[in-house]
């Protein structure tokens, strides 16, 4: 693409790679040769925004040194559902603490709160509009975890951490696979459509209310159909042959 008229460069992105969890199929890559820090949940336990910003700045330098210019992080989701398997990537359940640490994280990676600069690593805050309250703790990478609920009418509570991202002029926002179940916001019912396709969430709320004018980046495989293998799982022959379950398309 760099050779065409528009001169658009290829952008290399990555999930977090400065922590302990190694799950390259989904959420995080072990630090390896990169500096190793506590998971973001551990950083939240420390509760020091200056430290989180320092972490982001160090990780920024490491990313750029190897040609990575986009971070598929931070997670602004709140850990209000302890059964959900991704709470280690959050900043906990306190929405105000999460807001301050999300802001600091982005300022470290993007070098301040003035948006993208020549030495920035673009951050992608996720998963709008708050993926923490997965129904029964089941994850929306799978068709059986597609519902997202906000018990006690706490939808607005889950939006607060994203305010920190917008204050830091985050470069991109990623919605999740899930669909909102029985959700109302400011007296209006939200259509039960996946967040990545939901006009009320992306156009009215994100673009309209929050005035976000950056990139909306869909989560991976968002248009894949959920085929028979996706719904029923691998056959015994496939399991015996060592077929990875991550070859199964993500279900919507």
Which residues are covered by each model-predicted region?
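Glycoside hydrolase catalytic-domain context in secreted enzymes
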Residues: 1-252
